[in-house]
Amino acid sequence: MKVQSFDALYDEDSLMQKASRQEFSKYVDHIGTEGMQARSGLLQERQYPHLNALVDELMRQNPRLNDSLKERLELLRTGEAQVVITGQQTGIFGGPMYAVYKLLTCLKVARQTEELLNRPVLPIFWLATEDHDFDEINHLIVPTHDFRTRKLAIQAPDSISRSVSRLAFDQTAVKDIVRQALCTERETPYTKELLALSDRLIESSTTYGEFFASFMGELVDHDIIFFDADTEAVRQLEIPFFERLIQDNAEIRQALSKGIQETTELPDTFLNEEAAHLFVEDIGRDLLYPGQDFVTKQGKTYTELELLALLYASPERFSNSVVTRPLMQDYLFPTLAYIGGPGEIAYWTRLRPLFHHFDWTMPVLIPRMGAVMLQARDEKGLRRHGLSLEQVLHTGVPLTPFDAAAIKRHLHDATLLGTVLVEEVTRIEQQELRTTAVATKLNKQLQLAVETIVDQKRRLHEQANRSDRALQYQLAPDHAPQERIHSILPWLNRYGLNLVQTLRMHYEQTEAEQLKIML
């Protein structure tokens, strides 16, 4: 493996480029090394009375943590340790590759920050199991025979909107998908090992969150702490802050509107200014809307007192929206930094006034690592076309349509020459008083020769185009970023289960955050 900096991965005005620059400080509270130090000092002044119980729950959720990380996690009980957090929906086999890149960034930032602050810094991966959009996590993308994208998806168990954590984990369907996905790949020395690992992890998992954490943990020797907020133990810890979110709901919505107004020049993100930004579980997971009382989309109403009573009786029925989850994260954990992609950074900037409402500052926002992986054959394909990787990512691999008419026009001169030959042969035949239809026979042979040449050229063209479509699929499938479409699964099949650990080693040795990875 060879890793190089690749700044052309994102546009110059992308938040993946801007968010690390000093000019971005007008949208955030802390930035850079000094910002991390300032944030750490402020966290020391805050109280986290629930940390002992939180560590117990983290230990329960992460039985396979390596010994070094377990020892450092114990230091969170007293607040000596602080944390760096990233998060993602729990897609099967890790979802898109950028989830792996988030995880690696979290590990790297935690290590660097630990050295900077001279205190334990823990990497936390927040599992978005509260999310109810099953279609976001239920699939892998694989290539079709002509290198278009195709979804291999698990059917939703029912039509009711439920948190992913509440859905039955379909072991049979997930096993079927991994086999279908690997059928699109060549068998390698790693295939059987990958299948055996997949089957073992699938059979030991009862939820999609568990499977995600088990699979991703295996890739980095269980050197990261996964956190599932949608458990009864965590909901008990969250009661005091849910109470604040209910009681201060009007002020929170006003703060969100202010945050949106202050960041109009940043990329747009849809954050619902009308919602209460809390979900309650009834028949399914339903978003609350404020009014004289709180109302669900299904029309069920709750007074503030009724919601508070329900909260204390059944906290497991409550969950956060995309707006309130970052606030709950800051309530639960002494959070130094959050690692996110461009969309997350865009909406986090809108939340600044909400943090200030609680007399907090925002964590440091750090763009995740971005990357594109190239195989040796991909580099050969680029050289064959005389293309740079940047050109392919921005404009794609040029595919020329097959033009049979043009080829036939090109062969026209040869056909004319053949016609003259036929006429001469015919004249000689007639002089010799032969009566066979030689001219007709020769003309047919000429036409057959033309069609044969056209067919041969068509096959060569299709072969070249197939190779070009394969190159496009590998680097920018359907003209989308590789990291947003590809799963890590086929790459593990090609290069082995140590691939991510090898990438981690190279990534932690470079200062670059946008990478070209040559395999």
Swiss-Prot record:
It comes from the Bacteria. It is an enzyme of class 6 (ligase). The keyword Amino-acid biosynthesis does not apply. One of its GO terms (molecular function) is ligase activity. Its EC number is 6.-.-.-. Residues 51-71, 440-464 form a coiled coil. Keywords: Coiled coil, Ligase. Belongs to the BshC family. Involved in bacillithiol (BSH) biosynthesis. May catalyze the last step of the pathway, the addition of cysteine to glucosamine malate (GlcN-Mal) to generate BSH. This is Putative cysteine ligase BshC. It comes from Exiguobacterium sibiricum (strain DSM 17290 / CCUG 55495 / CIP 109462 / JCM 13490 / 255-15).
